[in-house]
Amino acid sequence: MSYFPWLTILVVLPIFAGSLIFFLPHKGNKVVRWYTISICLLEFLLMTYAFCYHFQLEDPLIQLKEDYKWIDVFDFHWRLGIDGLSLGSILLTGFITTLATLAAWPITRNSRLFYFLMLAMYSGQIGLFSSRDLLLFFIMWELELIPVYLLLSMWGGKRRLYSATKFILYTAGGSIFFLIGVLGMGLYGSNEPGLDLERLINQSYPATLEILLYFGFLIAYAVKLPIIPLHTWLPDTHGEAHYSTCMLLAGILLKMGAYGLIRINMELLPHAHYLFSPWLVIIGAIQIIYAASTSLGQRNFKKRIAYSSVSHMGFIIIGIGSITNIGLNGAILQILSHGFIGATLFFLAGTASDRMRLVYLEELGGISIPMPKIFTMFSSFSMASLALPGMSGFVAELVVFFGLITSPKFLLMPKTLITFVMAIGMILTPIYLLSMLRQMFYGYKLFNVPNANFVDSGPRELFILICIFLPVIGIGIYPDFVLSLSVDRVEALLSNYYPK
């Protein structure tokens, strides 16, 4: 048992160190860049050390617990703790944020503010994944919005203000329902608010109230995940944001919705989740097909990748809705797998469009010859995204498939139908990804452009790509490494649904 406040340090360090950026000497952007990257690296190393030496994988209970009284008036505590569900997400956050700060190297305008916002976002994400108090969870959920809004509206494309406003309206609208749910849960059945997750797990509610609470939380997560029809902010946002912001959005922000769905809706409201789960599976299946076919019609290749993200989120929703050991583990695996693959595809799309100043597929063609490295990595990650065996996407989708098929909750006919729909979605994925690769990289179009001096990716970009490629291959070959983190915790969680 470790009594050292590891998690508090992990949550507070980035935002505290980030606020010191403004006091650094004005000697160009180099100082700020190196300072930010060293903070991210330090945070990631601390995180890895704490989890390696102070976290027991065999123990399905909450570990590294911290509980400090914060606001006395209504008994609000700073409660942190992690288990197998949050461990993978926290490590993913550390890994992707460190590489995203390295990806943001070319940013020179207002770089201090940019890096501060990235570090503030880092704190919010770690805080969300490790909070054990419902109100603290909500505060961290909201802490995320402001940095993302500013990163979008200040360092984006031509329509950045439109997409930033759309993002804030959608997410703030979802947060209203979230807050109502938090207050309803905290105030039910007692005079003073009790928001401790440990206490709320044992709380039971009247059926109508539980369904209303579930629905309130679901709307907030449906915006973040996103679940159709609340997904329309995502393509606009990804189309306009700087690619380092896109890495954080695709890699971590979307996963917060899935994490909330498991952590709050599944754990605290099991009866309502049992009722809603068939609908989640149906929506997930529709989402896979709908987003894949919409992606096929996108002219802007950034938006095409954004819709592919929405499609892949469908597998997570199906895994969560299947209420089986295998399905939920598959959903957690897909959270990590898509975190790596989605972030890298946006990074590649951003670096490619920065070089060519073009985003429409019909204007592109023939870039594989001047940019062979970008072409190779783009093809490799597209293969990972379309679930090529040997890469993480394949394992995650396969495990979700098995989870749905073995689910005792669904009859054979609906299972067969949904599996068939998922299979069609998996066939559509290579169609839109390979057609995008063909239009971008093959042909001869760009050689007719005057002074076409394209530069291939340099050592910094290759370093980022290879760093992410290794875990994608690693998870694809040996998924047990990731599954072992969550398997005991998932079993404990599902014992509420199927009592022994």
Curated annotation (Swiss-Prot):
TM region positions: 4-24, 37-57, 87-107, 113-130, 134-154, 167-187, 211-231, 242-262, 272-292, 313-333, 334-354, 386-406, 417-437, 462-482
Major enzyme class: translocase
Catalytic activity: a plastoquinone + NADH + (n+1) H(+)(in) = a plastoquinol + NAD(+) + n H(+)(out); a plastoquinone + NADPH + (n+1) H(+)(in) = a plastoquinol + NADP(+) + n H(+)(out)
Membrane-topology annotation of the record: Multi-pass membrane protein
GO MF annotation: an example: NADH dehydrogenase (ubiquinone) activity
Cellular location(s): Plastid, Chloroplast thylakoid membrane
GO cellular component: chloroplast thylakoid membrane
Top-level lineage group: Eukaryota
BP GO terms, sorted: aerobic respiration; ATP synthesis coupled electron transport; electron transport coupled proton transport
Enzyme Commission numbers on file: 7.1.1.-
Keywords for the protein's UniProt record, in alphabetical order: Chloroplast, Membrane, NAD, NADP, Plastid, Plastoquinone, Quinone, Thylakoid, Translocase, Transmembrane, Transmembrane helix
Coiled coil: none
Family stated for the protein in its record: Belongs to the complex I subunit 4 family.
Protein name per the record: NAD(P)H-quinone oxidoreductase chain 4, chloroplastic
Phylogenetic placement of the source organism: Eukaryota, Viridiplantae, Streptophyta, Embryophyta, Tracheophyta
